């Protein structure tokens, strides 16, 4: 019989979302060592720069030390591109989600945002092995 395992992924991690996640993370921590992947948004919806909250950044650093993984999850996690022009684009960008940040970006802008997120992780000393 194979050993059982569990991987837990926390979506849209930012100082703004931490009050919702905190009780859940504390409950999971009480169960023992459950590895978590935190999908970190550097500036959630353009209103919540991660590095403006040093306490939260230190929390993420402690989680890395504990063995959790941080993954870059966009930069703003918000679709701020010009309005959609076709029914298909409208569905994908307004009905399905307003958070498809990279859906309408050109290569250069997508690369700029990814580079900014990668640089934030580098400054904080957080290993980065993925982007979701």
Positions of predicted regions on the chain:
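Short hydrophobic/aromatic-rich motifs at helix boundaries and adjacent loops
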Residues: 30-33, 88-91, 112-115
């Amino acid at each position: 019989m194979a050993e059982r395992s569990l991987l837990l992924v926390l979506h849209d991690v930012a100082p703004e979302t931490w009050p919702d996640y905190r009780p859940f993370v504390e409950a999971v921590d009480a169960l023992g060592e459950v590895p978590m992947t935190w999908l970190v948004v550097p500036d959630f919806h353009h209103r919540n720069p991660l590095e403006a909250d040093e306490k939260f950044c230190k929390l993420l650093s402690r989680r890395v030390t504990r063995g959790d993984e941080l993954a870059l999850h966009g930069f703003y996690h918000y679709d701020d591109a010009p309005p959609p022009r076709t029914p298909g684009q409208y569905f994908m960008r307004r009905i399905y989600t307003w958070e498809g940040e990279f859906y309408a970006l050109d290569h250069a802008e997508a690369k700029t945002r990814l580079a900014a997120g990668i640089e934030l992780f580098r400054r904080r000393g957080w290993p980065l092995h993925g982007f979701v």
